[in-house]
Structures are given as structure tokens and as C-alpha cells.
């Protein structure tokens, strides 16, 4: 029996909606990354994007355990000498709630063009509303 290799145009992608209320950031991000890659499917192929679309609502209500709300640091750099910026989880969640989950999931996906394509299938929203009702997403319990 030959090894099965999925072809990009034959992949069936579903839409799922996840409620992030009171979910732990890392546990939610790990499951979302797994589903974006398509590892939950029997047709998973490492070099093909076989994952589903994931819509996460209420990302402003995500939580972290322990003292990470103040201790977890996020860094970015302007490109100039001495141009490093640092913020913690609480400040980033107040200012850009979607970015917290996006950064966590991005670190769990492969780097390169395939990983960027997978990340585009993640849609994060701070409130309970999302504009993807036309895709009829199924509710996913994590």
C-alpha cells in the first residue's frame, strides 16, 4: 500500500468557532495550532496545509495561570540601536486582546510560507460577535 499524500486542492476545510471565555492561553493555543495544521485529520500531510478555519471569540477573557499576567513578557524591536520595546500580558491584553492568542499560536506553527498560510486561517475577536456567520461555523468545545 502506498503512502497517502494529500493534495492541496482536494482538502476539505471546515469552519469552527471556539469560545475563549476563562480558557487558559497555552492550552487553547496548543489545540488551535493542532487544528490549524490539520493533525486531527486522517489525511494529515506535513508539507500540505490540511487544517480547518478557526474563529475564536471572547479572546479578551483568556487567562493565564500563576503570576504570568505580570511576569510574561512580549518583546518587539524597532530596528534601531536600543529600540527594544517590552510589554507584559496584562497590558497587551488590554490594548490588543487578539494579539495575545495570535502570538501564542504563531509560535506553535511551522515557520515559513506554509506556517503563514495556516496562521491566516485563524480569526480572533475580542467580543462575542464575529462576521463569519455565512460560513456556518460549528461550535468546537476545547
Swiss-Prot record:
SUPFAM superfamilies: Ribosomal protein L13 (SSF52161). Keywords: Ribonucleoprotein, Ribosomal protein. One of its GO terms (biological process) is negative regulation of translation. One of its GO terms (molecular function) is structural constituent of ribosome. It holds the Pfam family Ribosomal_L13. InterPro entries: Ribosomal_uL13 (IPR005822), Ribosomal_uL13_bac-type (IPR005823), Ribosomal_uL13_sf (IPR036899). Coiled coil: none annotated. GO terms for cellular component: cytosolic large ribosomal subunit. Disulfide bonds: none annotated. This protein is one of the early assembly proteins of the 50S ribosomal subunit, although it is not seen to bind rRNA by itself. It is important during the early stages of 50S assembly. NCBIfam families: rplM_bact. Part of the 50S ribosomal subunit. Belongs to the universal ribosomal protein uL13 family. This is Large ribosomal subunit protein uL13. The lineage of its organism: Bacteria, Pseudomonadati, Pseudomonadota, Betaproteobacteria, Rhodocyclales.
Amino acid at each position: 500500500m502506498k503512502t497517502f499524500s494529500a493534495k492541496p486542492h482536494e482538502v476539505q476545510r471546515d469552519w469552527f468557532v471556539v469560545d475563549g471565555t476563562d480558557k487558559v492561553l497555552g492550552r487553547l493555543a496548543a489545540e488551535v495550532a493542532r487544528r490549524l495544521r490539520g493533525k486531527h485529520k486522517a489525511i494529515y500531510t506535513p508539507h500540505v496545509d490540511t487544517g480547518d478555519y478557526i474563529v475564536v471569540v471572547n479572546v479578551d477573557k483568556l487567562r493565564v495561570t500563576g503570576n504570568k499576567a505580570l511576569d510574561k513578557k512580549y518583546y518587539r524591536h524597532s530596528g534601531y540601536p536600543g529600540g527594544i520595546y517590552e510589554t507584559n500580558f496584562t497590558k497587551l491584553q488590554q490594548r490588543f486582546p487578539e494579539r495575545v492568542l495570535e502570538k501564542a499560536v504563531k509560535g506553535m506553527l511551522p515557520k515559513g510560507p506554509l506556517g503563514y498560510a495556516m496562521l491566516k486561517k485563524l480569526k480572533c475577536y475580542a467580543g462575542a460577535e464575529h462576521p463569519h456567520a455565512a460560513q456556518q461555523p460549528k461550535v468546537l468545545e476545547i
